[in-house]
Structures are given as structure tokens and as C-alpha cells.
Amino acid sequence: MFHYTYNQEEIEIKEQISQQDVTYHIVVKSESMRSRVKEVRRYFEGNKDYTDVLFFSREDGSFEVIVRLNMIESFLIHAFRFKCLQSISWE
């Protein structure tokens, strides 16, 4: 599986794994991080597979992101690419 780190002063991430997907509950703590999360969202909303990664914005400003199991690696790599994550490792 994957292990990742992030700046806890800027973002909080909790994940919930099911048999078909992983749901990430993301609380953004800075406007610069909010912009980076939106870049990840734009990337996945702009590709041709509309069900690979689904973003939902919550009223409190947090995000719920549902990622198909076969897309977790891609999601984490792009979160790292847009500097939402500090590191990723495979275990």
C-alpha cells in the first residue's frame, strides 16, 4: 500500500478504504493549499475518465474525494505533483 506525508498546518487528510474505492476526507487550512487541491481537482475533471476520481466540496470548505482503487496511485502522484503532499512511499 501507500504511505504519504503532508504539512499538517496546511491540510488534514483522512482516508476510508472500501472494496471498490478509497474516500479521502480533506480539510484545507490555508488558501494556498486550497488552490493546490483545486489544481488536482481540475486535472482529474479534465481527463476523459469521469469516474476515476470524484471531488465533492462541502459547505464547511472541506472536500470529499472518492478514488477508484485502480486510480489511487495516480491520485497520490498528482497530489504530490501539485504539492498537496510532501512525500509518497510504497510499502
Set out the residue ranges of the language-model regions.
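Short, compact, well-ordered microdomains
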Residues: 53-91
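Short, charged/polar N-terminal "headpieces" of proteins
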Residues: 1-16
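Inter-domain helical "communication" segments and dimerization helices
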Residues: 11, 19-22, 81-87
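Generic "edge-of-domain/loop-turn" microfeature
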Residues: 11, 31-33, 72-74
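Short glycine-/aliphatic-rich beta-strand segments at the starts of folded cytosolic domains
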Residues: 13-31
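Short, flexible, solvent-exposed loop/turn segments with mixed acidic/basic and small polar residues
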Residues: 12-18, 48-58
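Short amphipathic alpha-helix segments
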Residues: 2-4, 28-49
